[in-house]
Amino acid sequence: MTIDISEESLSKESADLLKILLKDRTTKKSIVWATHSYELLGKGFAPSDRITPSRVTGTYANLIQPRSEKSKYEQKDRTKIRAEVFTPTWLVEKQNGYVEAELEAMDLEDYIQVSWLEITCGEAPYMVTRYDTVTGEEIPLSERVGFVDRKLQRISREVSDEVTFYELIKEVYRASYGYEYQGDSLLLARENLL
């Protein structure tokens, strides 16, 4: 079983959604590859080239994969060249748990509005733990430990009104930030937040 979210499927379900996921919020253009991993594919795949829907669908539909599904050689190469490492879920749980312990006494609305930033987020495991970034095993909703996951779990436990529920969900996303330079990892992070 794969934990990858198919860009091909995203494009078919909503071409606009894929374009949104590929948009650089600063330049208003598409995000760049920012990695040499794909440049052997030719024009359009250099580190400074922009990632367009046609570069991740069709012939290239399975090009971008989570780290756990990349070859060991590719994992090692990206670690060596870009210092790309991935934190195992048990460590994310422990570190986020320390912060969570400081926040658990807050009322729900204040808790939801606490801003969190995951810098150099990779696939964003500190935000959302859809799967273990090391093993690739999918993690059930109730066991996810990212800071967005924890906020969503608390809303699910404490809110029964549907309108309030959805408003608070939007607030969670408005208060959650991740920064990533490499375009493929950024796209994976954004997909994980869906």
Language-model segments: residues:
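Non-catalytic, mostly N-terminal accessory regions of nucleic-acid modification and defense proteins
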Residues: 1-115, 121-124, 176, 190, ...
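Conserved S-adenosyl-L-methionine
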Residues: 91-94, 102-194
